[in-house]
Amino acid sequence: MPSKNGPLRVGIGGPVGSGKTALTEKLCKAMRERYSLAVVTNDIYTKEDAEALVRMQALPSERIVGVETGGCPHTAIREDASINLQAIADLNRRLPELDLVFIESGGDNLAATFSPDLADLTIYVISVCQGEEIPRKGGPGITKSDLLVINKKDLAPHVGADLEIMERDAARMRGEKPFVFSDMKRGDGVERIVDFLILHGGL
């Protein structure tokens, strides 16, 4: 149920190509029967991710809003989140029954984080293809996100990444904070992410 403070807002961040849009699509398809959902995507100069989600039929088009952030996508989710907050306010007006809004950041680096004014929970997505050392490199996305998703685990043998090393490093860098290995192509790991959102988001 949406609270008097509005819907749960979940930020989805991660480097370009890590699988943010694929994750957003899978979460929408897994949760849309039970909850009233919407998505705000951030792209630098286009609305490409929003259009991709409409094409994937993740949600009806009126529930997907794309914002163009200009040159610094991380500013729109952190220092000046007003463009995203405005998009959420507009969705709220049109869809007053909203339970949950996903905010997908533009492709960013390991240092980008969501402002607490914008996101109640944060998911950070990295890809096995970026190298097995990514978890131990740290950065706020790795260490501070509420949930770390290590995506494309199926490609580990092809890129020479050792999942056991990645698991050990992620556990060391994150302490008690959870992380999940996933393969969005096959939907592997989606259920655990949904369970996390229900448990920690109070849905």
From Swiss-Prot:
UniProt keyword Ion transport, yes or no: no
Positions bound to GTP: 14-21
Primary location: cytoplasm
Location(s) in or outside the cell: Cytoplasm
GO cellular component terms attached to this protein's record: cytoplasm
Keywords: Chaperone, Cytoplasm, GTP-binding, Nickel insertion, Nucleotide-binding
InterPro entries for the chain: CobW/HypB/UreG_nucleotide-bd, P-loop_NTPase, UreG
GO function term, MF aspect, one: GTP binding
GO biological process, one term: urea catabolic process
A family per Pfam: cobW
Subunit record text: Homodimer. UreD, UreF and UreG form a complex that acts as a GTP-hydrolysis-dependent molecular chaperone, activating the urease apoprotein by helping to assemble the nickel containing metallocenter of UreC. The UreE protein probably delivers the nickel.
Function, in words: Facilitates the functional incorporation of the urease nickel metallocenter. This process requires GTP hydrolysis, probably effectuated by UreG.
Annotated family: Belongs to the SIMIBI class G3E GTPase family. UreG subfamily.
Protein name, per record: Urease accessory protein UreG
Organism: Sinorhizobium medicae (strain WSM419)
Name of the gene: ureG
